[in-house]
Amino acid sequence: MKNILLCTDGSDFAQQSYPYAAWLASKLGGNIKVLYVTDIRAQKAVESVNLSGSIGLGTSEELLKQLVDLEHTKAKLNHQKAKLVLATAKNTLQQAGIESVQVMHKTGFLLDCLEDLKGDFDVIILGKRGETAKFAQGHLGANMERIIRSIPKPCLVTPKQFQTITKVLFAYDGSASCQKILQFLAGSSLLADLPLHIVTVGKTNQDPQAIANLGTAEKVLEKAGFKLEVELLVGHAEEAIVRYQEDNAIDLLLMGAHGHSRIRHLVIGSTTAQVLRKTSIPVLTFR
């Protein structure tokens, strides 16, 4: 995870992702690229306007010219905003001690840009919600869900308030995405110095598959030298995981974006999406 891509739109949520990016880069000795994407949809909408059928030809041409001029002005303002947001992010990261920071401004769709860049980064960081957060409280950012579903890289989803990471929780279900997390933890020094809690959610406290899953994870991570707390939870997965996180003052949650059994693939209403909605800590997902 040496190459970190930090997505920002300048919102409150995005700005709180900067210290998490700095923490990750400092722990890994990594570099950060900061990406700001100007949405192309508004520009395309004006280019496709045809007013000739609704008002007089001369009037429509004049109005369309005014609309185009307005869009040019908006484009300049968007460019200035992007420069300001990126400069603020770079300054914040450098003040936090990160020397290797690059900034990028692209126009288009965020997901398309990430697809183009996915060979250039190892992990992506973005806020749980973006600029429209105050208008859709309780919802996840639309970009965030699509990114987790589509980009085959770990994704750190950050909350509105930064807090120092001192304890980590791994929600393990034995799925392929959780196996990736297990391999990452065993082979990385990122979280090796922090207490690690492992939980899985079973149908009962005697669930044989859940017990086997916990045993597998515990064996691998004990061998890797982690100080572990292991717990079998019972109930609705998302509620049990969030309750455990709150009761044990966990600062970082790791879970698979796609799972099976009690932790299912990421769709609206799934365990991963529900946990992301309900928790107030950063969540590192693996696909």
From Swiss-Prot:
A Pfam family this chain is assigned to: Usp
Region forming the signal peptide: none
Lineage top rank: taxon: Bacteria
InterPro entries referenced in this protein's UniProt entry, alphabetically: Universal_stress_UspA, USP_A, UspA
Record-annotated disulphide pairs: none
Record-linked SUPFAM superfamilies: Adenine nucleotide alpha hydrolases-like
Gene3D superfamilies: 3.40.50.12370
Similarity remark: Belongs to the universal stress protein A family.
Protein name listed in UniProt: Universal stress protein Slr1230
UniProt source species: Synechocystis sp. (strain ATCC 27184 / PCC 6803 / Kazusa)
